[in-house]
Amino acid sequence: MDILIVENKDNTISDLKTILQVLGHKVIGLASNGKVAIKIAGELNPDLILINIKLNGEMSGVEAAKFLVSLYKIPIIFITVFTKNCLTKSLQLPDDAVTISEPIRKEHLEYCISRVLEN
């Protein structure tokens, strides 16, 4: 599966790339903010996007994800340090949003990928 990572922390990017490679996926692009993510997604057409809820720049990860889904219909997994209950209420994530908490663990990422692909 071709995956776009939208993340502003180098250590998280490194962890994700390593885990995704072990799981047999290919990271086809990296972006550190929402505007770049939207541009890259349009150019590379990833199968899945992993996006941090808190991004640098004018656009949050949630705002960027809304654009990405409406423009390209690409499944999204949100990366966060918060719990899902906290996020659903404070950031108005949909109830069916798939989130993964940092630190990223291989088994959890594998589970999240399978969940998002079911929808």
Place the predicted regions along the sequence by residue.
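Acidic, metal-coordinating helix/loop segments flanking the phosphotransfer/catalytic sites
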Residues: 30-48
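Short amphipathic alpha-helix used as the core "switch/output" element in two-component signaling
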Residues: 62-73
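C-terminal output helix
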Residues: 86, 104-117
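As written
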Residues: 91-100
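Hydrophobic/aromatic residues positioned on beta-strands within the core alpha/beta folds
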Residues: 79-80
